[in-house]
Every structure is written in C-alpha cells, then in structure tokens.
Amino acid sequence: MKGSVVFLRSLLCLLCLLPSTLHCEDLEIHVRSESSLLPIAVSLLSSPKDSRQASYLASLRDLFARDLALGDLLAPTKELAPQTIFIEASYPELIFSLKKEGKGSQKIFSLELSGDPSKDHQAIHEAADRIHFLLTRVPGISSGKIIFSLCATNSSTELKQGELWSVDYDGQHLYPLTNEHSLSVTPTWMHISHIPAYMYVSYKLGVPKIFLNTLNQPAGKKILAMQGNQFMPTFSPKTKLLAFISDRDGNPDLFVQSFSLATGAIGTPKKLLNEAFGTQGNPSFSPDGTRLVFVSNKDGTPRIYQMQISPEQHSPRLLTKKYRNSSCPTWSPDGKKIAFCSVIKGVRQICVYDLASGRDEQLTTSTEHKESPSWAADSNHLVYSAGSSNTSELFLLSLITKKSRKIVIGSGEKRFPCWGAFPSQHIKKTS
C-alpha cells in the first residue's frame, strides 16, 4: 500500500499539492461590463393560494434568473427590457413564454412542479439552460452536475479516505455517490447522452483500479482485468476509447482501450508510447476522439503534449513552450481550447491555450495552488480545486469575466472536480 501511495504522489495533479495558504477571494481581472450583456426581463405571473406557495414560486423565479446570468451573456432583470420571459404559474404547472419587443408573447414550453425542492430546482436549471441556448445559441450551464472527491480534513492515516459526491454549481443539493470506505479520486463523466455514467479510480481493492458507476448506484464495478496500478481515466464517446495511465510495465505509461458501456472492455489495452517518453499522465481527448493531450516529463519537467491517435497514430508534439511545469490538460467541448495548470512564480495557476492562434493565457493570479480544471458545456467556464496539501475548495472560473468564485459546500478537502451530465437543451416546437 505504501508503494502505491508513493507512486500516486509522483504523478501529476493528484493528492500532493505544493504548500500554500488558502485564500478564497474572488479574482478581479478584466471584468466584463454590464452594457455588453443582453438584458432579459423575467416576470412571474401567479395567483398563489397562500403565502408559502407565493414564497416558493418567487424563490424559483429568482433561481431561474441566477441560472440565466450564470453564463455571463444575459442580464436578467425585473425591469423593462427588449425581451421578456414570462413564467406563468398555475400551480403545479409553470408555462414559459417569450415576448420580443413589438411582438406578441409566444409559449416556449411548460413543466410541472413536484413540490420536492431538489427535483424542482433541477427542472428550473434545465428550463433556464434551454432558454439560454434559445436566446444566445450558447449552451446554458446551470443544469450540469459537478462530481468530486471529498476527504476529511487533517486525516491521520497515510492514505486518506475519500468518497465521491455531486453538487450543483451553486453548492446546493450536495449528494453522496459512493460509500466504499476507501479512497476514490479523479472522477470523469463519460458524456454519454441520457446516461449519467462516470469513471473513477478507487483504492478499495488495495491498489488503484478504474471503476465505472452511474449516479443512482452506491458502488462502482472494476472495468479492466490488466495488472498494475491504473490512474486518470478519460473516455471518448465518439471513438469509444478509454485512455488511462498504468505502470503495468514498470513506467507510468499512457494506454488506450476500446470500451463499450454495454459490453465493457473490448480487446486488450494498447500502450501508445515507450519509456523514452518518461512518466506520462493526465490524458484528455479532443471532442472528436482523434487526438489526446497529456503530460510527460521526458525533458526533465512536466510539459503538455498533443498527439493524433486516429485514424493513424502520429508522434507527440509539444503544445506550448511558454510554461515548463504544467499539468492537468483538458480539452474544451467546442474543441478550440485546452485548459491546464502551470507553476508561475511558484504558484500553480489555471491557464488556457487557444489552438487556432497558438497563444496561451494565464487566467488566475491568487496565491493558492490550483488543480484539476474541468469545462462546462459552454466552453466559457471551468470548475477547479484550489488549496494546499491538506485544504482544498472548489471554484468556478469564467473565461468571459476572468473572475473566480468559491462553491460553498462545507468542511473537508474537495478535489478532482468534473463538470458534466448536461441534459439536452433542444426545444421542441409548440403549437
């Protein structure tokens, strides 16, 4: 067990962060002005039967407005605006309509409340995201789920116990996903439509192995029979390939494995590189599944490389020469950007690389060390963890405003966040 811990700590962006003092302040860089946002009035039309129902409907209206504003493209208001979203409440039904300036109101869709705040909040998140997409053609991001590993702070054991949890972007509806009494890390959504499946690494068998689970199951199942430690899974639904790191042959190497949610692993894992490429880690697929980014220390310090793997494999090439101590690359859903971590002036910061221009940009500046950036569906927002060796919190980061804000959850170390499980935002035409 001790050897597994040493190996895990030698990999990038896992349990060991550089020492730092945690400061949970917002970042103040190039804030987008309100005048560049699209104003949208949100009006609740209701005749509640009592004050409790009135208060509940008003809270849902406010939640809907916050959801619309989350993407940093819309400015919801109770004042007059060129466009208005009407929420007509005929409890338990809510009817959403859109009125544009100089035109009549048109029904968009309706939903039925259950009276369960958790279910109703999710329904409002999904409604807001669908309307956000309708107005901006950019996906809304309030309806996704953030999964992460939660460990007790100041654990005295050498190998901490950490279960997986899910939470909404606003810190609400914190929900336990696993109850395995072990250490679970690096959860990753599989991004398969209508199936909230995710992979993660667990130590419940004594050594780190990759497991598969869904939101409604308390324990996952091991998916690979291969020997050795297994780390950092990532899945491409386009090519049905699983990429991961394993020390089966002695060195932490990058492997790919054909995988189906229905049948499991198909064939045997393929090692992509040899030991001449050093220790490898943190793979991430392009949206089309034909390329990977990953980290290698073959030149002495961890740097990020990009490699085509389909339809034929090409040699890796260095992604950026600007930073020499980088980790945790993750490809944006639109395929245009790669977010990553890099040590800048002694602090691990979040950066982003633009594939079209070849330019990279530092997004954060605060003094706590950051790790594990994960994209929202709009490719404009990230979730990441930040802290020190024994404290860690989750933060949301906007590439539009360049501001971060803490997700207030409670005590414990929150690490390895992954944002996903975004429902379809297609709106069917109504008569």
From Swiss-Prot:
Keyword flag DNA-binding: no
- Gene3D superfamilies registered for this protein in UniProt: TolB, C-terminal domain
- Gene it is expressed from: tolB
Subcellular location per UniProt equals: Periplasm
Q: What are the annotated GO cellular component locations?
A: periplasmic space
- Where is the signal peptide, in residue numbers? 1-24
Record family assignment: Belongs to the TolB family.
Q: Which residues cross the membrane?
A: none
Q: Keywords in UniProt for this one?
A: Periplasm, Signal
What the entry lists under InterPro entries is as follows: 6-blade_b-propeller_TolB-like, PD40
Protein name, entry field:
Protein TolB homolog
UniProt cross-references to Pfam families, sorted A to Z = PD40
